[in-house]
From Swiss-Prot:
One of its GO terms (biological process) is mitochondrial electron transport, ubiquinol to cytochrome c. It is found in: Mitochondrion inner membrane. It holds the Pfam family Cytochrom_B_C. GO terms for cellular component: mitochondrial inner membrane; respiratory chain complex III. Heme b b566 binds at H89, H188. This is Cytochrome b. The gene is MT-CYB. It is a multi-pass membrane protein. Belongs to the cytochrome b family. GO terms for molecular function: metal ion binding; ubiquinol-cytochrome-c reductase activity. Its main location: mitochondrion. The keyword Ion transport does not apply.
């Protein structure tokens, strides 16, 4: 059969029989990246990277281009779906100990940073009020770097303030970075298949494996169909659910919004940044909130890979997950009590997860040794 020849590569790929739905998100991320590249190309055809025309070109895409509203919403809401999938993908990796495949985990964390950079540059492109001010606040953090900060900021802006050169280079970066993401994704998958994926038990599954096709292709397609249905329903019925009302106004450097905030998927890092009153301290905490993922494979001390049989780590993991949601919510609120205190406490708990990981692993080993 012709389709069997096409899928022979997948058929020859042995996968554990007991992997759950949480392992579907890798293929979903691949689909998301394909959607983003395709819709991004069609948007780039009509977009104008000029501060006087950028906002108007977005309006033109939405109103005049055939199906432009759908392409634009697919790209914008598709980015939110991308981040939902990647956060679940990372959470699964943390819970089931997938990070012990070090090369795969480190390449994946690098991918996350590249994806966040790409999304940030993309958020600036419509040149709406919130786009402009979010870009001003975030890029200004570079000035906190001793000695080099001012020069780096001027170089990034292409002048002494955010202006036309800034928008041009942000568009160039937003266009080129996805190709780097695709290349690194290929390496990520290649490194994963060197060792093979883990499973919910965290055990060696060599004795109990099945072909990827047709079993897991069907399983992936079901989840993919469900997610794409939700995406299209959101685009059709709630197209502005993730948009900030301020961004429907053209950027005005003379009027500051009452409350500056980036897109929802950056709010956990932005909340940690805001919770520290010192500029350099906040910038370091912002960087560490993502960079700390690089340390996870090296601080694992438990003899058990997965958290399935580690109740104390399960408690810490779900505390960490709820803290992530709490910081995201608090970052949407103005910088005033009680939101400042909530963000500060939540930020401490966020980093405590990574500190407690090796300590609890060591304690579990002691308990197992003594029983």
């Amino acid at each position: 059969m012709p389709h069997q020849k096409i899928l022979m590569l997948f058929g020859l790929l042995p996968v554990a029989t007991n992997i759950s739905t949480w392992w579907n998100f890798g293929s979903m991320l691949l689909t998301c990246s394909m959607i983003q590249v395709l819709t991004g190309f069609f948007l780039a055809v009509h977009y104008t990277a000029n501060i006087n025309l950028a906002f108007s070109s977005i309006v033109h895409i939405m109103r005049d281009v055939p199906c432009g509203w759908m392409v634009q919403n697919l790209h914008a809401i598709g980015a939110s779906m991308f981040f939902i999938c990647i956060y679940i993908h990372i959470a699964r990796g943390l819970y089931y100990g997938s990070y012990l495949n070090k090369e795969t985990w480190l390449s994946g964390t690098t991918l996350l940073i590249m994806l966040m950079a790409t999304a940030f540059f993309g958020y600036v492109l419509p040149w709406g009020q919130m786009s402009f001010w979010a870009a001003t606040v975030i890029t200004n953090l570079l000035t906190a770097i001793p000695y080099l900060g001012g020069t780096m900021t001027t170089w990034l802006w292409g002048g002494f303030a955010i202006n036309d050169p800034t928008l041009t280079r942000f568009f160039a970066l937003h266009f080129i970075l996805p190709f780097g993401i695709i290349s690194l994704s290929s390496l990520h998958v290649l490194l994963l298949h060197e060792e093979g994926s883990s499973n919910p038990l965290g055990t060696n599954s060599d004795i109990d494996k099945i072909p990827f096709h047709p079993y897991h292709t069907m399983k992936d397609l079901l989840m993919l169909t469900t997610t794409l249905t939700l995406l299209l329903m959101t685009i059709s019925f709630f197209p502005d659910i993730f948009n900030d009302p301020e961004n429907f106004s053209k950027a005005n450097p003379l009027v500051t919004p009452q409350h500056i905030k980036p897109e929802w998927y950056f709010l956990f890092a932005y909340g940690i940044l805001r919770s520290i009153p010192n500029k350099l301290g906040g910038a370091l905490a912002l960087a560490m909130s993502i960079m700390i993922l690089f340390t996870v494979p090296f601080i694992h001390t438990s003899k058990l890979r997965s958290m399935t049989f580690r109740p104390l780590m399960q408690l810490m993991f779900w505390t960490f997950t709820s803290t992530f949601v709490l910081i995201t919510w608090a970052a949407t609120k103005p910088v005033e009590p009680p939101f400042i205190s909530i963000s500060q406490v939540a930020s401490i708990i966020y980093f405590t997860f990574f500190i407690s990981n090796p300590i609890l692993g060591w304690a579990e080993n002691k308990i197992m040794k003594n029983t």
